[in-house]
Amino acid sequence: MISNLEIKNYKSINQMELNCSRINVFIGEPNSGKSNILEALDLSFLSWMMHINEVNKKVNTELIDLKSFFRVNKVADMFHLGNFNSPISITHPGFSAGTNIEYIQDKEKDINLFEFNNSNGSFTNFDSDFIPQDPLQFYATPIKPYRYKSNIQFHDTGNYIQRLMAPFGNNLAKVIYHNTDMQQLAKEFAKEHGFDLNIDNANDNITLQLRINEGIVYSLSYEALADTYKRILFYSAAVKHTNARVITLDEPDTHAFPPYVSYLAEEITKQKEVQFFIATHNPYLLNSLIENSPADQLSVFVVSYDRLNRTTVTKKLSDNDLSELLDFGVDIFFNLNRYSNDSIEYPS
């Protein structure tokens, strides 16, 4: 487990140190830098995502748009205030090799490159568009990001089978097919709406079917399914069926019906062997995690942007703060200033 995390020179973060728990939740106003904290951890998976793309090119399957994933137009946008003089550095002593990204000049080829390297001495060079350069070297990591996409191309390139493929879960159909708990979850949701679940294992496809009469079946493709349904399947698989030791989830509660948000929170608390880093704006998710997590296994950080020092900062809530949220029903999302700088704000 990551006990201590240090991030330097990444996007809005100049320098940040966090004392982490098994479940780490980041809350704060939009554009405060919550997602940047998750992305900093995701950088350790960057080399492997490049590997996934190289494999997918050969079999003509969906590529990961790395610019979109990291929300940049070019690699240079990842450096804090465009500072190339210092590398991007993510360290977590005692857990796994740290990650560095630094700017380098290839004088022989007269091109500017970036080098992904870790404390084990491994490296991958790539250009400003995230295109890896020879020699191609890629490295796996125990940290995996999971990000929901409404429309994905199902495939199991890499033969993950029972474990959900990061970052988008392209093998979700296989995961449901090979795990009875996922089958049950999918079937129950379909049954509530009068449909039957159909998994086409040969073609990696998910549909819901409604029997009209003998020999007549109406089918709904995965793309046409309700967003809440697709999200709960994806995030349930990510939480329960991963080989990662650490996973990051960015607003897994978006567009989700409150009972499903509470269900997801309960599943997160049950996975004792996995560490979570989660950004959220959802009081249902936050309160469910506080209610169901032992105090020593949960950390909640209020994230804000320090305009004076031009950096994202965090404040970890105390046990008393968390008790107050539950005991008095305080909606922290209307009182963020109270917990970050002791002032109180109310909704208008």
Predicted regions mapped to residue ranges:
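Phosphate-coordinating catalytic segments in nucleotide- and nucleic-acid-processing enzymes
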Residues: 46-246, 306-348
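Switch/communication elements of ASCE P-loop NTPase nucleotide-binding domains
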Residues: 1-50, 216-348
